[in-house]
């Protein structure tokens, strides 16, 4: 069992979205489904066959967005935090749901959560999960 892992998912961060409906059938939006599959893939690689973590865990999610091309160089240098959509809690929900049973047994184990959204030189989500079992 790993006590701490980190991994990065390249590409534009995606947030958890409410399931869509088509008549009587409900479906997961395609963008969300493909992003969840990518998160699962990178999490599985990071775990390298280790058993999921037991007990309380701390999860850190850093969502980095590429600044819009329409922004001037000055604005790109001045603006760091991303305050528009997607919501930070929905990004964390998508990640925790995707890594459920891969990194930890159940996402209810997440006892401490930190999520940041900001602009950077590439679009990526960086995820770190650490067991709090021994140290608190």
What are these regions (language model features)?
Residues 1-136:
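Acidic, proline/glycine-enriched N-terminal capping motif
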């Amino acid at each position: 069992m790993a006590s701490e892992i980190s991994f990065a998912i390249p590409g534009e961060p995606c947030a958890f979205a409410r399931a869509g409906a088509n008549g009587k059938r409900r479906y997961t939006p395609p963008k969300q489904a493909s992003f969840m599959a990518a998160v699962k893939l990178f999490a599985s690689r990071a775990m390298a066959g280790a058993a999921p973590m037991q007990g309380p865990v701390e999860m850190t999610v850093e969502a980095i967005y590429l600044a819009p091309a329409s922004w001037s160089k000055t604005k790109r240098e001045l603006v760091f935090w991303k305050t528009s959509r997607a919501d930070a809690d929905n990004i964390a929900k998508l990640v925790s749901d995707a890594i459920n049973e891969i990194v930890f047994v159940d996402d209810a184990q997440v006892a401490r959560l930190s999520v940041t959204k900001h602009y950077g030189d590439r679009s990526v989500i960086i995820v770190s999960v650490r067991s709090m079992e021994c140290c608190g």
